[in-house]
Amino acid sequence: MIKPLIEFCVGNLASGSQAALEKLEKDPNLDVMEYGCLGYCGICFEGPFALVNGEVVQGATVEELVNNVYDYMDENPMF
């Protein structure tokens, strides 16, 4: 089974999304990756974000980001 891919920018982790990465890593149904730069510097500067299957998902807080990641996956199933 292919798992949803959640990607984080290391620069954004330093800005606060580290806690979201740690929460999402605990979910065995997700592949969570960390990269040096994802090329979304403007979005990265604004606040917590991640790429979910290649699409930008943002949150005003870490909790909101985690919730938005799950909401996005519910609204956009892979199959």
UniProtKB/Swiss-Prot annotation:
Spell out the Pfam families in the cross-references: DUF1450 (PF07293)
Q: Name the protein family.
A: Belongs to the UPF0349 family.
Name used for this protein in its record? UPF0349 protein BcerKBAB4_4757
